[in-house]
Amino acid sequence: SLHDALPIFSTFNLHWVSTLSMRLGSILAAAVSTWIVFRTGTLIHSARAGWVAALLYTCSIYTSIIAGLFIMPDSPQLLFFTWSIYWMAKWVIKPQQFNWINWIGLGCLIGLATLSKVHGLYLWAGFGGFLLFHQIRTLKQPFLYIAILVTLCFVLPILYWNLGNDFITYKFHSKRVLHSGIQLASFTQQILGEFLYQNPLVYISC
């Protein structure tokens, strides 16, 4: 996981240890993510749309405080997650300019997002769904599959560690979230959590 990389980077390998330095990596990652969201909105529509997107992103309690201030794996994940979406948007807007280097770059970005938290693989699921319904001819593009293989290379350390530790990561989360039958209380808790984490005003406006 890249969870430890940000504090190691921001503290100069623990040569500068303070409350600020420990959180600085997450703060910088959140700042860059906000800029990427602005660039994505600008690319898709206009600078004004980019500004509004960046404002909504910053107003989210999750992106600005939880992932943007606390020392969590979400901090590097959001950086590479938003960067991957920007790269995908570039392909949607200007597919003719998307060469093999761009495809490999996308594979690396999604790989880094996945190395932060395995949820990063959903980026390929979402992008694959878009291609299937809107750009099915791209599924014949060989560099698409090379990019997926690049991402899988980033997943190998996760698999290696879990193989050596009896897949404890997934066993822990399975015991925590998997229950038999419909859990109305858990469903309500999830929806309420999303509502509060994203900032009620942002949740409603979006």
Language model segments and positions:
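Short acidic/glycine- and proline-prone juxtamembrane loop motifs at membrane-interface regions
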Residues: 68-76
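Membrane-embedded alpha-helical segments of multi-pass membrane proteins
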Residues: 24-32, 59, 75-83, 124-125
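Short hydrophobic alpha-helices at membrane interfaces in multi-pass membrane enzymes
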Residues: 90-111, 141-145, 149
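Transmembrane-lumen/periplasm boundary regions of multi-pass, lipid-linked membrane glycan transferases
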Residues: 112, 124-206
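Specific aromatic-rich, kink-prone transmembrane helix
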Residues: 36, 56, 76-94, 105-110
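Short helix- or helix-capping micro-motifs
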Residues: 53-59, 110, 114, 128
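Transmembrane-helix motifs of polytopic, lipid-linked glycan transferases
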Residues: 20, 24-44, 83-87
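Loop-to-helix entry region of an early transmembrane alpha helix in multi-pass inner-membrane enzymes
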Residues: 5-7, 12-32, 70
